[in-house]
């Protein structure tokens, strides 16, 4: 086994399905899967398949999603082996995927749970308050975003009473919030977020691009690989004749900001429009653009497909898409196919739906492909592709 993980050995946690597979074999299997899915679009003497970008094999995750079980005096942070049995809690505080700094933070959180009287939610009895702890770290400055997912606001006064003691033990510039999820269901978070700190974001930095992590906004969980993903996209387009471009499903702006910075170094009039449904992510992207002092950059909280289909402006020179697992879907793919944009960048965490979208992008040729091992020890991977309009 390439990682010493007692939880996998005992089959308590099998999230890393491929833990017994040598890392080189994992990469080869992912490459085979990717080539199989995109084989109809690989053109001889044209499509360049670049070597995969590897990940660290441990401590690569920046985020822990912990189900809280056990008792208020002895909380268990990890998973429930049986979703409906509150006695089946497995403590995963020693998971080898987490950053080393989490090792010191988890005991602090267990102590805080006891002091604030945050009784773990019992799914069988529908009683208790604390459902999950969500912990995210910035690799840039080691600050953390700590979110307590509670059934109600009932324990807020006790949490606030114990907060100064907690903050004194957490890294500088950390963010603490309560998320209220009242439903009796295995839903990770609710809509209400109550910040207990003045700061509401933690700052990450990839390739001198500041990126801001907020609650309820998507952020890649493997920062080392993510930073190389964004840098690669930037490198692919930096010398192209681009006046304006779209970043659809832009999240916190990782792709768009990297590309805008490189393009505006040569031509400050280059325009970027970034579109994302999550208002929280758009607030982060806007904050980054302001800090970078980029001009002609607009981020808007809209549905990416609806924006593209309804836009009556000048056609962009480049469109970047980074959709969720379902892909961009047929209507948007067909629209982009007819739009006639010279260049497309498609980043995907699901090559199967990407290949389906490629079928509708028949006016484009696949020029570059690179696999990024964002999710080691699993069958999942990220893939970055570059498509050009057929002449």
From Swiss-Prot:
SUPFAM superfamilies: S-adenosyl-L-methionine-dependent methyltransferases (SSF53335)
Source species of the chain: Actinobacillus pleuropneumoniae serotype 3 (strain JL03)
Keywords: 4Fe-4S, Iron, Iron-sulfur, Metal-binding, Methyltransferase, rRNA processing, S-adenosyl-L-methionine, Transferase
Record-annotated active site: 349 (nucleophile)
Keyword Iron-sulfur: yes
Residues involved in S-adenosyl-L-methionine binding: 220, 249, 276, 322
PROSITE patterns: SAM_MT_RNA_M5U (PS51687), TRMA_1 (PS01230), TRMA_2 (PS01231)
Enzyme Commission number: 2.1.1.189
Protein name listed in UniProt: 23S rRNA (uracil(747)-C(5))-methyltransferase RlmC
């Amino acid at each position: 086994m390439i990682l010493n993980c007692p939880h996998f050995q005992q089959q308590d946690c099998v999230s890393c399905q491929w833990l017994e597979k040598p890392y080189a074999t994992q990469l080869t299997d992912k490459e085979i899967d990717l080539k199989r899915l995109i084989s109809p679009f690989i053109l001889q003497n044209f499509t360049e398949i670049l070597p995969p970008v590897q990940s660290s094999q441990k401590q690569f995750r920046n985020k822990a999603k912990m189900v809280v079980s056990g008792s208020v005096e002895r909380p268990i942070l990890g998973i429930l082996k049986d979703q409906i049995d509150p006695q089946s809690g497995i403590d995963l505080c020693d998971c080898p995927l987490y950053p080393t700094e989490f090792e010191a933070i988890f005991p602090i959180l267990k102590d805080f749970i006891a002091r604030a009287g945050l009784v773990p939610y019992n799914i069988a009895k529908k009683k208790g308050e604390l459902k999950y702890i969500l912990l995210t770290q910035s690799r840039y400055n080691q600050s953390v975003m700590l979110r307590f997912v509670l059934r109600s606001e009932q324990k807020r006064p006790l949490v606030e009473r114990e907060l100064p003691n907690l903050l004194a033990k957490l890294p500088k510039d950390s963010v603490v919030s309560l998320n209220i999820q009242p439903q009796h269901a295995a839903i990770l978070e609710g809509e209400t977020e109550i910040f207990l700190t003045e700061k509401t974001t933690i700052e990450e930095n990839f390739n001198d691009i500041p990126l801001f992590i907020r609650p309820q906004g998507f952020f890649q969980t493997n920062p080392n690989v993510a930073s190389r993903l964004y840098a690669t996209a930037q490198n692919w387009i930096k010398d192209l004749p681009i006046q304006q471009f779209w970043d659809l499903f832009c999240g916190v702006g990782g792709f768009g900001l990297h590309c805008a910075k490189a393009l505006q170094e040569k031509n400050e009039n280059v325009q970027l429009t970034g579109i994302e449904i999550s208002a929280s992510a758009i607030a982060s992207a806007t904050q980054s653009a302001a800090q970078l002092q980029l001009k002609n950059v607009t981020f808007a909280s809209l549905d990416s497909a609806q924006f593209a289909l309804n836009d009556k402006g000048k056609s962009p020179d480049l469109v970047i898409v980074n959709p969720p697992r379902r892909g961009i879907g047929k209507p948007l793919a067909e629209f982009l196919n007819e739009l006639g944009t010279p260049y497309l960048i498609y980043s995907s965490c699901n090559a199967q739906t990407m290949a389906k979208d490629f079928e509708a992008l028949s006016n484009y040729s696949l020029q570059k492909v690179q696999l990024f091992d964002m999710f080691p020890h699993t069958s999942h991977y990220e893939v970055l592709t570059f498509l050009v309009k057929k002449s």
